[in-house]
Amino acid sequence: MSIKLVAVDIDGTLLTDDRRITDDVFQAVQEAKAQGVHVVIATGRPIAGVISLLEQLELNHKGNHVITFNGGLVQDAETGEEIVKELMTYDDYLETEFLSRKLGVHMHAITKEGIYTANRNIGKYTVHESTLVNMPIFYRTPEEMTNKEIIKMMMIDEPDLLDAAIKQIPQHFFDKYTIVKSTPFYLEFMPKTVSKGNAIKHLAKKLGLDMSQTMAIGDAENDRAMLEVVANPVVMENGVPELKKIAKYITKSNNDSGVAHAIRKWVLN
């Protein structure tokens, strides 16, 4: 059965190390679209952090979709209509916020509107995230967060501090939440039902596609869930070694237009 849905991660996959979309990748995406293939961005970023990429790839028109917040939100890329939205509760927020204080690491919560932190001394990686995803930062005390629609929370800090903190997180948190380390300085907390994999399942069903018609392309541990559910998992040459063990195909690196290579070799052929 031919591949009709291709989910593509952004950082380390779609983009080069200097954060560009190569001409070759752009052309391959257009070729796939012309053959009726749904090319879908699947990212941990919020929608504000991918709008410019959707525009560059011409994936912001009728019939296009985007997976954001690692699967916490699936939207129509043209209208913004929400197909899937899974939120953390206020109790989830409090529990995770107070854990971060106990562990001595910075924390922020993300909604569709912005990045919220209770850290009076705002962490540099919160500022980094704000710049990366083009979202404002708001300082709010925990008491002021009661009515916020939180899609994910992030512990953010220096890699050595974060690694030490991770070792002290009680097992209860791993049982209750989906927890992924998306970069050496980001640890993301989401509802247990949230993953890029579940988002792809929802989207494939909406589009009337069988999972045998799906492909995912990624490079990092937060791509594992989507690589495990699709029939055609593709890992970048620059991907994590453990991830390559579950790949059906290994494509070229992100700096060598690996997404274009994968689309042309295994989707359009």
From Swiss-Prot:
Keywords: Hydrolase, Magnesium, Metal-binding
Transmembrane segments: none
Protein name: Putative phosphatase M6_Spy0533
Binding of phosphate, residues: I10, T43, G44, K196, N222
Gene Ontology cellular-component terms listed: cytosol
Active site per database record: D9
Amino acids binding Mg(2+): D9, D11, D219
Family according to the record: Belongs to the HAD-like hydrolase superfamily. Cof family.
Obligatory cofactor(s): Mg(2+)
Top class in the EC scheme: hydrolase
